[in-house]
Amino acid sequence: MQYDQIIDISKWDKVKNDAHYLLYDEYYRASKKSVKKVVYYIDSYYERMEDLNYLGYTKNVLFKNSDLYTISNLDTLISANVPYKKAKKYLAVKGAQIQDIKKYVDSGLSPLKAVLHVSYPGIDSSKRDDRTYTIEDPANMLVLIKNGFSVPSDYVPSDLRDVNIPYESEVGQLRDEAATALEKMYKDGLKQGYSIAIKSSYRSYDTQLAVYNEYFAMYDAAYAASLVSIPGSSEHQCGLSVDLTSQSVMNGEYGTFGEAPDYNWVEQNAYKYGFILRFPENKGDRTGATNEPWHFRYVGKEAAKEIHDKGWILEDYIEHHGFAYNLRLN
Protein backbone atom coordinates (compact mmCIF):
# COMPACT_ATOMS: atom_id res chain seq x y z
CA MET A 1 0.00 0.00 0.00
CA GLN A 2 1.34 3.44 -0.93
CA TYR A 3 1.84 6.25 1.61
CA ASP A 4 -0.66 8.46 -0.18
CA GLN A 5 -3.33 5.79 0.27
CA ILE A 6 -2.82 5.95 4.03
CA ILE A 7 -2.03 9.58 4.79
CA ASP A 8 -2.14 12.92 3.05
CA ILE A 9 1.43 13.27 1.79
CA SER A 10 0.72 16.66 0.25
CA LYS A 11 0.28 18.11 3.74
CA TRP A 12 3.85 17.19 4.64
CA ASP A 13 5.36 18.12 1.29
CA LYS A 14 4.43 21.76 1.88
CA VAL A 15 7.71 21.97 3.81
CA LYS A 16 11.10 20.47 3.07
CA ASN A 17 11.27 17.01 4.65
CA ASP A 18 13.07 13.66 4.66
CA ALA A 19 9.95 11.69 3.69
CA HIS A 20 9.28 9.97 7.03
CA TYR A 21 5.57 10.25 6.32
CA LEU A 22 4.25 7.57 8.64
CA LEU A 23 6.25 8.96 11.55
CA TYR A 24 5.11 12.49 10.71
CA ASP A 25 1.50 11.39 10.85
CA GLU A 26 1.94 9.39 14.06
CA TYR A 27 3.75 12.20 15.87
CA TYR A 28 1.29 14.78 14.58
CA ARG A 29 -1.60 12.85 16.09
CA ALA A 30 0.20 12.46 19.40
CA SER A 31 1.58 15.99 19.78
CA LYS A 32 -0.96 18.19 17.93
CA LYS A 33 1.97 20.38 16.85
CA SER A 34 2.19 22.28 13.57
CA VAL A 35 3.33 20.61 10.35
CA LYS A 36 6.61 22.53 10.39
CA LYS A 37 7.39 21.56 13.99
CA VAL A 38 6.45 17.93 13.37
CA VAL A 39 8.73 17.63 10.34
CA TYR A 40 11.64 19.23 12.19
CA TYR A 41 11.18 16.97 15.20
CA ILE A 42 10.81 13.70 13.29
CA ASP A 43 13.66 14.39 10.86
CA SER A 44 15.89 15.26 13.84
CA TYR A 45 14.64 12.29 15.86
CA TYR A 46 15.25 9.90 12.97
CA GLU A 47 18.95 10.80 12.94
CA ARG A 48 19.14 9.82 16.63
CA MET A 49 16.71 6.90 16.57
CA GLU A 50 19.29 4.10 16.66
CA ASP A 51 21.01 5.51 19.76
CA LEU A 52 17.68 6.24 21.46
CA ASN A 53 16.29 2.77 20.76
CA TYR A 54 19.47 1.22 22.15
CA LEU A 55 18.87 3.07 25.42
CA GLY A 56 15.18 2.15 25.45
CA TYR A 57 13.75 5.53 24.47
CA THR A 58 11.36 4.18 21.84
CA LYS A 59 9.03 6.36 19.83
CA ASN A 60 6.14 5.22 22.03
CA VAL A 61 7.94 6.62 25.07
CA LEU A 62 8.93 9.87 23.37
CA PHE A 63 5.69 10.63 21.57
CA LYS A 64 3.64 10.35 24.76
CA ASN A 65 5.49 13.29 26.30
CA SER A 66 6.68 15.42 23.42
CA ASP A 67 7.08 18.55 25.53
CA LEU A 68 9.64 16.81 27.75
CA TYR A 69 11.55 14.98 25.04
CA THR A 70 12.71 17.92 22.96
CA ILE A 71 15.54 17.39 20.47
CA SER A 72 17.93 19.12 22.83
CA ASN A 73 16.82 16.80 25.62
CA LEU A 74 17.22 13.76 23.37
CA ASP A 75 20.85 14.76 22.78
CA THR A 76 21.28 15.11 26.54
CA LEU A 77 19.89 11.62 27.14
CA ILE A 78 22.21 10.12 24.54
CA SER A 79 25.22 11.91 26.05
CA ALA A 80 24.25 10.85 29.57
CA ASN A 81 24.01 7.23 28.41
CA VAL A 82 21.36 6.44 31.02
CA PRO A 83 18.97 3.67 29.91
CA TYR A 84 15.26 4.47 30.05
CA LYS A 85 14.77 1.56 32.44
CA LYS A 86 16.88 3.44 35.03
CA ALA A 87 15.74 6.94 34.12
CA LYS A 88 11.97 6.52 33.94
CA LYS A 89 11.28 6.60 37.69
CA TYR A 90 13.09 9.94 37.96
CA LEU A 91 11.52 11.38 34.83
CA ALA A 92 8.08 10.54 36.25
CA VAL A 93 8.63 13.07 39.08
CA LYS A 94 7.04 16.46 38.43
CA GLY A 95 9.74 19.02 37.75
CA ALA A 96 12.40 16.50 36.70
CA GLN A 97 15.06 18.11 34.51
CA ILE A 98 16.56 15.86 31.84
CA GLN A 99 19.96 17.55 31.99
CA ASP A 100 20.23 16.29 35.59
CA ILE A 101 19.27 12.67 34.87
CA LYS A 102 22.75 11.21 35.44
CA LYS A 103 23.06 13.09 38.75
CA TYR A 104 19.67 11.70 39.83
CA VAL A 105 20.75 8.13 39.12
CA ASP A 106 24.18 8.59 40.73
CA SER A 107 22.73 10.24 43.85
CA GLY A 108 21.42 7.02 45.35
CA LEU A 109 18.38 8.94 46.59
CA SER A 110 14.72 8.12 46.04
CA PRO A 111 13.34 9.66 42.82
CA LEU A 112 11.55 12.54 44.58
CA LYS A 113 14.46 13.36 46.87
CA ALA A 114 16.93 13.13 43.99
CA VAL A 115 14.99 15.58 41.83
CA LEU A 116 14.51 18.09 44.64
CA HIS A 117 18.06 17.79 45.99
CA VAL A 118 19.81 18.01 42.61
CA SER A 119 17.61 20.42 40.66
CA TYR A 120 15.90 22.55 43.30
CA PRO A 121 18.12 23.47 46.25
CA GLY A 122 16.67 26.98 45.89
CA ILE A 123 13.35 25.85 47.35
CA ASP A 124 15.14 26.76 50.57
CA SER A 125 16.36 30.32 50.09
CA SER A 126 19.24 29.77 52.50
CA LYS A 127 20.88 27.48 49.92
CA ARG A 128 22.72 28.93 46.96
CA ASP A 129 21.12 28.23 43.58
CA ASP A 130 21.95 30.16 40.42
CA ARG A 131 19.20 28.49 38.42
CA THR A 132 15.83 30.11 37.80
CA TYR A 133 12.64 28.37 36.72
CA THR A 134 9.37 29.30 35.08
CA ILE A 135 6.28 27.58 36.49
CA GLU A 136 4.38 25.86 33.69
CA ASP A 137 1.07 25.62 35.57
CA PRO A 138 0.77 28.87 37.53
CA ALA A 139 -2.90 28.12 38.24
CA ASN A 140 -2.00 25.23 40.56
CA MET A 141 -3.20 25.96 44.09
CA LEU A 142 0.07 24.76 45.62
CA VAL A 143 2.38 26.76 43.40
CA LEU A 144 5.63 27.93 45.02
CA ILE A 145 6.33 31.47 43.81
CA LYS A 146 9.47 33.20 45.07
CA ASN A 147 12.79 34.46 43.76
CA GLY A 148 14.01 31.76 41.38
CA PHE A 149 10.49 30.43 40.75
CA SER A 150 8.44 32.75 38.56
CA VAL A 151 5.25 32.81 36.54
CA PRO A 152 4.98 34.27 33.01
CA SER A 153 4.57 38.04 32.89
CA ASP A 154 1.28 37.69 31.02
CA TYR A 155 -0.29 35.26 33.51
CA VAL A 156 -3.64 36.45 34.83
CA PRO A 157 -5.83 33.96 36.76
CA SER A 158 -8.99 33.20 34.81
CA ASP A 159 -11.26 33.05 37.87
CA LEU A 160 -10.42 36.33 39.62
CA ARG A 161 -13.33 38.06 41.33
CA ASP A 162 -13.99 40.80 43.86
CA VAL A 163 -13.88 39.68 47.50
CA ASN A 164 -16.95 40.70 49.46
CA ILE A 165 -15.27 41.92 52.65
CA PRO A 166 -14.12 45.42 53.73
CA TYR A 167 -10.98 46.84 52.18
CA GLU A 168 -8.59 49.64 53.05
CA SER A 169 -8.32 51.52 49.76
CA GLU A 170 -9.57 49.51 46.80
CA VAL A 171 -11.70 46.44 46.19
CA GLY A 172 -9.61 43.30 46.63
CA GLN A 173 -9.59 40.48 44.09
CA LEU A 174 -8.69 36.83 44.55
CA ARG A 175 -9.32 33.62 42.68
CA ASP A 176 -12.82 32.34 43.31
CA GLU A 177 -11.94 29.51 45.71
CA ALA A 178 -9.67 31.73 47.79
CA ALA A 179 -12.20 34.57 47.77
CA THR A 180 -14.97 32.28 49.02
CA ALA A 181 -12.72 31.00 51.82
CA LEU A 182 -11.73 34.53 52.88
CA GLU A 183 -15.36 35.66 52.94
CA LYS A 184 -16.20 32.73 55.23
CA MET A 185 -13.27 33.57 57.52
CA TYR A 186 -14.40 37.21 57.66
CA LYS A 187 -17.97 36.26 58.61
CA ASP A 188 -16.83 33.81 61.28
CA GLY A 189 -14.45 36.41 62.69
CA LEU A 190 -17.25 38.94 62.99
CA LYS A 191 -19.20 36.50 65.15
CA GLN A 192 -16.31 36.51 67.61
CA GLY A 193 -15.73 40.25 67.56
CA TYR A 194 -12.97 40.45 64.95
CA SER A 195 -13.21 42.44 61.72
CA ILE A 196 -10.54 41.76 59.11
CA ALA A 197 -10.15 43.73 55.91
CA ILE A 198 -8.09 43.60 52.72
CA LYS A 199 -5.06 45.84 52.43
CA SER A 200 -3.77 44.30 49.18
CA SER A 201 -4.61 41.21 47.16
CA TYR A 202 -4.17 40.34 43.47
CA ARG A 203 -1.50 42.35 41.67
CA SER A 204 -0.73 42.09 37.99
CA TYR A 205 2.85 41.78 36.77
CA ASP A 206 2.83 45.45 35.75
CA THR A 207 1.56 46.57 39.15
CA GLN A 208 4.25 44.51 40.89
CA LEU A 209 6.85 46.04 38.58
CA ALA A 210 5.75 49.53 39.65
CA VAL A 211 5.99 48.55 43.35
CA TYR A 212 9.40 46.98 42.75
CA ASN A 213 10.75 50.09 41.03
CA GLU A 214 9.37 52.31 43.80
CA TYR A 215 11.19 50.35 46.52
CA PHE A 216 14.44 50.32 44.60
CA ALA A 217 14.22 54.08 44.20
CA MET A 218 13.87 54.50 47.99
CA TYR A 219 16.31 51.90 49.36
CA ASP A 220 19.60 50.26 48.47
CA ALA A 221 19.29 47.18 46.26
CA ALA A 222 19.96 44.54 48.93
CA TYR A 223 17.44 45.96 51.41
CA ALA A 224 14.80 46.58 48.75
CA ALA A 225 15.14 43.00 47.50
CA SER A 226 14.32 41.73 51.01
CA LEU A 227 11.13 43.80 51.10
CA VAL A 228 9.57 43.31 47.68
CA SER A 229 9.42 40.42 45.23
CA ILE A 230 10.88 40.56 41.76
CA PRO A 231 8.04 40.96 39.20
CA GLY A 232 6.90 37.49 38.16
CA SER A 233 8.04 36.10 41.52
CA SER A 234 5.32 37.69 43.64
CA GLU A 235 2.64 35.50 45.18
CA HIS A 236 0.15 38.30 44.62
CA GLN A 237 0.19 37.62 40.87
CA CYS A 238 -1.22 34.13 41.43
CA GLY A 239 -4.42 35.53 42.98
CA LEU A 240 -4.07 33.33 46.06
CA SER A 241 -2.37 35.75 48.47
CA VAL A 242 -3.79 38.57 50.50
CA ASP A 243 -2.32 41.22 52.78
CA LEU A 244 -4.76 41.70 55.64
CA THR A 245 -5.51 44.54 57.99
CA SER A 246 -8.44 45.10 60.35
CA GLN A 247 -11.10 47.65 61.13
CA SER A 248 -9.33 48.34 64.42
CA VAL A 249 -6.14 49.31 62.54
CA MET A 250 -8.06 51.44 60.05
CA ASN A 251 -9.76 53.17 63.00
CA GLY A 252 -6.35 54.01 64.49
CA GLU A 253 -6.68 51.76 67.55
CA TYR A 254 -3.54 49.83 66.55
CA GLY A 255 -0.56 50.81 64.45
CA THR A 256 -0.23 47.59 62.46
CA PHE A 257 -2.22 44.43 61.84
CA GLY A 258 0.39 42.37 63.69
CA GLU A 259 -0.38 44.31 66.89
CA ALA A 260 -4.15 43.87 66.67
CA PRO A 261 -6.15 41.08 68.38
CA ASP A 262 -7.65 40.36 64.96
CA TYR A 263 -4.22 39.14 63.81
CA ASN A 264 -3.95 36.65 66.66
CA TRP A 265 -7.34 35.21 65.76
CA VAL A 266 -6.44 34.94 62.06
CA GLU A 267 -3.05 33.36 62.80
CA GLN A 268 -4.69 30.69 64.96
CA ASN A 269 -7.61 29.96 62.66
CA ALA A 270 -6.53 30.70 59.08
CA TYR A 271 -5.67 27.06 58.33
CA LYS A 272 -9.31 26.05 58.93
CA TYR A 273 -10.18 28.09 55.85
CA GLY A 274 -7.22 26.96 53.73
CA PHE A 275 -4.84 29.86 54.44
CA ILE A 276 -1.33 29.87 55.90
CA LEU A 277 0.86 32.64 57.26
CA ARG A 278 3.31 32.64 54.37
CA PHE A 279 6.26 34.54 55.86
CA PRO A 280 6.39 33.83 59.61
CA GLU A 281 8.95 35.15 62.05
CA ASN A 282 12.36 33.46 62.15
CA LYS A 283 11.84 31.74 58.79
CA GLY A 284 13.14 34.48 56.52
CA ASP A 285 16.35 32.64 55.69
CA ARG A 286 14.29 29.84 54.13
CA THR A 287 11.38 31.78 52.63
CA GLY A 288 13.62 34.54 51.33
CA ALA A 289 11.32 37.21 52.80
CA THR A 290 11.22 39.11 56.06
CA ASN A 291 8.41 38.44 58.53
CA GLU A 292 5.06 39.66 57.16
CA PRO A 293 2.31 39.05 59.74
CA TRP A 294 -0.25 40.45 57.31
CA HIS A 295 0.52 38.16 54.34
CA PHE A 296 -1.67 35.05 54.09
CA ARG A 297 -1.62 32.53 51.27
CA TYR A 298 -4.42 30.19 50.19
CA VAL A 299 -3.29 26.59 49.64
CA GLY A 300 -6.53 24.71 50.33
CA LYS A 301 -7.75 23.18 53.59
CA GLU A 302 -5.89 19.87 53.35
CA ALA A 303 -2.45 21.38 52.73
CA ALA A 304 -3.07 24.24 55.19
CA LYS A 305 -3.94 21.80 57.98
CA GLU A 306 -0.84 19.71 57.39
CA ILE A 307 1.37 22.80 57.30
CA HIS A 308 -0.26 24.10 60.50
CA ASP A 309 -0.18 20.81 62.39
CA LYS A 310 3.48 20.11 61.56
CA GLY A 311 4.70 23.65 62.10
CA TRP A 312 5.81 23.84 58.48
CA ILE A 313 6.15 26.60 55.93
CA LEU A 314 5.25 26.10 52.27
CA GLU A 315 8.87 25.23 51.51
CA ASP A 316 8.65 22.28 53.92
CA TYR A 317 5.49 21.07 52.23
CA ILE A 318 7.11 21.13 48.79
CA GLU A 319 10.26 19.41 50.07
CA HIS A 320 8.09 16.64 51.52
CA HIS A 321 5.52 16.19 48.74
CA GLY A 322 7.32 17.58 45.69
CA PHE A 323 5.87 19.80 43.00
CA ALA A 324 2.36 19.22 41.66
CA TYR A 325 3.33 20.81 38.33
CA ASN A 326 6.26 21.02 35.93
CA LEU A 327 8.87 23.75 35.75
CA ARG A 328 10.99 24.98 32.86
CA LEU A 329 14.64 25.86 33.40
CA ASN A 330 15.26 29.40 32.14
Q: What does each model-found stretch correspond to?
A:
Residues M1-S200, Y205-N330:
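Extracytoplasmic cell-surface/polysaccharide-interacting catalytic and binding patches
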